[in-house]
A protein has these predicted regions:
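Aromatic-rich juxtamembrane segments at the membrane interface
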Residues: 9, 157-288, 293, 518, ...
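Core dinuclear metal-dependent hydrolase active-site scaffold
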Residues: 216, 316-324, 447-568, 614-689, ...
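Cap/insert and terminal regions of metallo-dependent hydrolase folds
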Residues: 593, 675-749
Length: 757
């Protein structure tokens, strides 16, 4: 019986239930209930066959519920109690700082809080911090688990329980940065610097830095997007693939003697684990590799389920909130899929060939091994990627088959080259050409496949949810019925047919009516899609909520609608909450014309947009006068800024979509005084829909402006914010002119379809 596996999975199940279900004190009652059940089992089932296993399930389950409650009370709650106010802090810097738009941020370990962590935001002086330094001062404490009405699990899953916004008195002082404890962090930085020194091609060095250390900050945005879209981004989550490559490399370099291999490899694996940041995926991989290495020393076979359970147990004991980590869920789900399904799939894929041609059998085994690993991982991770990322990558098996073997060789060659670079850089640069060629090949595969129209499908198409459920039902039915290979062929054919139907039906939904307008739920930002007569335009795309993905949502929605090219992109103004998603849209979807206000901005947004537009072959038009263009059965009119100076909000464009006697007006972030000047400057019609300016700010929606355009409906694009958007005054002014109010923070994405002009 797998005792450790039973204990580990039972404990983990309790932690997952506690972490993912709402906290309202039920855990303590549940602990008592499970203990009573264990007591009843102790007396009632003593002579039963499964008596021992029952106790091994129930007791760890009870312990996990109590452990989570205790951890929350002792570690997280004291920090949570200080949030919402400004107070003093003393902390130790535990990683290298990163630059932000307003200065810098760094992860710190809070003194007096059981080594719990926080992220400190401060001035650019923080960039001088080193791991081990001490930082003190006053900061505004904000919970890392809650942003207004939204619960956010990302920070707590990393052991970060507060966000500290430093005041002017934040002081940095030298600490024990040279201590052995911080050696992995120093080694990680040296590793990244050596990668940049060996490979002067920024695309290659960024790729290899991500592959070797998991740090994706230097990667080309377009390349990382291509890796995500083709199912290859897992190469940058340092995991079993990387640890297996590392162990293989060490086995080739030192010896096959098991004791020596363990003595050298296990400390290096642990050091590498800390160096790359101790993400759940690398911790899981290292523990499983250690089990695999030491099993022969005890004359035992390594059991993957036991090592997987042990890894999960260790991670959740260190931080039970890690159960909410997307990285952990994907890593363990993929590994579980490979453990349970990969051998059966491999047998199924190779069993049909009975020939004796050795080269053909070798090739078949290679293909089958890669496909079985990929497909078995996808079976367990597809629901998670659908839920978290809204995507199902159709080309993942093919992209993995073509790219993953090359990634393995590039990792090993690059690792050796970097180590050699610390000894003799010229020889390392020469060896680096191997990795350069392999990385270029992988990027060629990824970018090429991303250009395929159906490389992936997106769950912004609601019919795909039913398709995915059908897919699992069909193949589970096949697995549960007697053996036979034809049933899998039939199931595959049915899956393709139903997928085609789901795509076609969703696209037909957008062919109805003369105009469809979608105000996407991008949080505190704005993005509006206009489609009419087979042509589509996008007005703005951005969000100030860092946990939102405005560009991904817009591009996914456009792909699901069947949009192959945007006729126009209109940028009302250059603030990030209206533009930071446009870069992904421009990389994923061709654009004919991008309309920009002819004003300068201090953030460099205009320059970046123009550069990317030129790279992608889009025409850039600066709007300096009233401009009208056809969009299928709709006329899209763009008005230039009506003010000659002031804030960027007041110097933006206005877009009017008119389909017959239906009019929809988008005014960006302009204030009421600018709206008033807009109707004084241009003869705007009575409109049916107003996309309310500046997310419903108290300074927007001037009453004279509203009485002039008389909207019948008002759409407010708004999310979590500290500005009080939408303000009660604005809502009352809209109601006063008879407008029905729709809000993305309450109704989600808002769709308006015009049946006739």
């Amino acid at each position: 019986m797998r005792v450790l596996a039973t204990i580990g999975f039972s404990f983990s199940a309790g932690v997952f239930l506690t972490a993912l279900l709402p906290w309202n004190g039920w855990q303590l009652y549940a602990t008592g209930g499970v203990l009573l059940l264990a007591l009843a089992w102790l007396f009632a089932a003593r002579k039963q066959k499964y008596f021992r296993r029952g106790l091994l399930i129930l007791l760890p389950l009870a312990v996990s519920l109590a452990y989570f409650a205790g951890y929350d009370h002792l570690v997280r709650q004291p920090i949570e109690d200080r949030c919402g106010a400004a107070s003093d802090f003393t902390a130790t810097v535990c990683d290298w700082p990163q630059a932000t738009e307003r200065g810098a941020r760094v992860t710190v370990e809070l003194e007096g809080y059981h080594r719990a962590r926080a992220v400190l935001y401060g001035e650019a002086e923080l960039l001088a911090a080193r791991p081990g330094d001490t930082v003190t001062g006053t900061a505004q404490w904000q919970s890392a688990a809650h942003f207004d009405s939204d619960d956010v699990t990302h920070f707590n899953a990393r052991g970060v329980y507060a966000l500290l916004y430093g005041r002017e008195d934040v002081r940095l002082s030298a600490g024990d940065g040279d201590a052995l404890r911080w050696l992995p962090q120093r080694a990680g930085k040296a590793f990244r610097e050596k990668v940049a020194a060996i490979w002067d091609d920024p695309r290659v060095s960024g790729f290899l830095t991500a592959e070797l250390t998991g740090d994706k900050s230097a990667m080309d945005d377009g390349d990382y997007l291509a890796m995500q879209e083709t199912g290859l981004a897992h190469l940058f989550a340092v995991s079993g693939l990387h640890c297996a490559f590392l162990v293989t490399l060490l086995a080739l370099l030192i010896s096959r003697r098991q004791r020596l291999l363990c003595a050298v490899t296990i400390p290096l694996l642990l050091f590498y684990m800390v160096m790359v940041g101790m993400s759940p995926s690398v911790v899981r991989a290292c523990i499983m590799q250690i089990f695999l290495l030491i099993a022969p020393l005890f004359r035992r076979g390594s059991d993957p389920l036991t090592s997987l359970a042990a890894a999960l147990l260790v991670i959740l004991l260190c931080n039970p909130f890690a159960a909410a980590s997307v990285s952990l869920q994907l890593s363990f789900s993929a590994t579980l899929g490979m453990v349970l399904l990969s051998p059966r799939l491999y047998k199924l894929l190779t069993g049909w060939y009975k020939g004796k041609c050795r080269p053909l059998r070798t090739a078949l085994c290679f293909v089958a091994a890669n496909l079985s690993a990929t497909l078995s991982a996808v079976v367990f991770t597809a629901p998670l990627t659908a839920w978290y990322f809204r995507i199902f990558v159709l080309v993942a098996p093919l992209s993995s088959l073509l790219a993953v073997p090359a990634a393995g060789w590039s990792f090993m060659a690059a690792f050796v080259a970097v180590l050699l670079g610390f000894v003799w850089l010229p020889l390392a640069s020469l060896l680096g050409w191997i990795s350069w060629a392999l990385v270029r090949y992988i990027l060629w595969i990824a970018n090429g496949m991303m250009s395929w129209r159906y490389h992936a499908v997106y769950f912004t198409n609601p019919y795909l949810i039913y398709w995915l459920l059908f897919l699992y039902a069909v193949f589970i039915g096949c697995a549960a019925t007697p053996d036979g290979k034809r049933k899998y062929l039939l199931a595959s054919a049915l899956s393709v047919l139903t997928l085609t139907a789901a795509i076609w039906v969703n696209r037909q939904d957008y062919q109805y009516g003369v105009l469809t307008a979608l105000t996407l739920d991008v949080g505190q930002g704005e993005s509006v899609i206009l489609t009419s007569g087979g042509e589509t335009a996008l007005v703005d795309c951005g969000s100030s909520n860092s946990y939102k993905d405005p560009g991904g949502l817009a591009a996914d929605t456009l792909h699901s609608m069947g949009v192959r090219e945007l006729s126009a992109v209109v940028v009302t103004h250059y603030h990030a909450d209206h533009t930071n998603g446009l870069y992904e849209v421009l990389r994923r979807i061709p654009v004919q014309t991008i309309y920009l206000p002819d004003i300068e901005d201090e953030y460099g947004v205009r320059e970046r947009l123009v550069s990317l537009a030129e790279e992608k072959g889009a025409q850039v038009t600066y709007v300096t006068k009233e401009t009208a263009d056809t969009l299928g059965d709709t006329v899209l009119t763009i008005y230039p800024p009506v003010q000659s100076g002031g804030d960027l909000n007041e110097l933006g464009l206005t877009a009017l979509a008119s389909a017959g006697d239906f009019d929809l007006l988008i005014t960006g972030d302009m204030s009421g005084s600018t709206e008033k000047k807009l109707v004084e400057t241009y003869a705007l019609p009575d409109i049916e829909v107003l996309v309310v300016s500046h997310h419903g700010s108290r300074y927007s929606s001037n009453i004279r402006f509203l009485k002039s355009v008389t909207p019948e409906a008002a759409v407010i694009s708004v999310g979590d914010n500290n500005y009080g958007h939408p303000s009660e005054e604005t809502l009352q002014r809209l109601l006063a002119v008879g407008a029905d109010i729709w809000r993305t923070d309450q109704q989600g994405t808002i769709r308006i379809t015009v049946n006739g002009g």
